[in-house]
């Protein structure tokens, strides 16, 4: 699954917002997204994806939430 799909899945499954570091940790722990080089997903990558999709995500009180 793509990184944006993995982020949406985690936030929707949890039912509440998550911090960026929590999202990155869960993506890696659950192996929801694999980088082409085999390295773990970084919190910088997660943050960059979130910032590229303002129509999907909002940052409130240090947590990332879905706009839906």
List where the protein language model places each region.
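Short helix-capping/hinge SLiMs at alpha-helix to coil transitions
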Residues: 12-16
């Amino acid at each position: 699954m793509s990184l944006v799909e993995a982020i949406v899945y985690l936030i929707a499954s949890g039912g509440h917002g998550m911090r960026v570091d929590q999202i990155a940790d869960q993506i890696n722990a659950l192996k929801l997204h694999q980088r082409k080089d085999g390295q773990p997903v970084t919190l910088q990558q997660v943050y960059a994806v979130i910032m590229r999709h303002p129509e999907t995500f909002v940052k409130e009180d240090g947590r990332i939430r879905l706009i839906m």
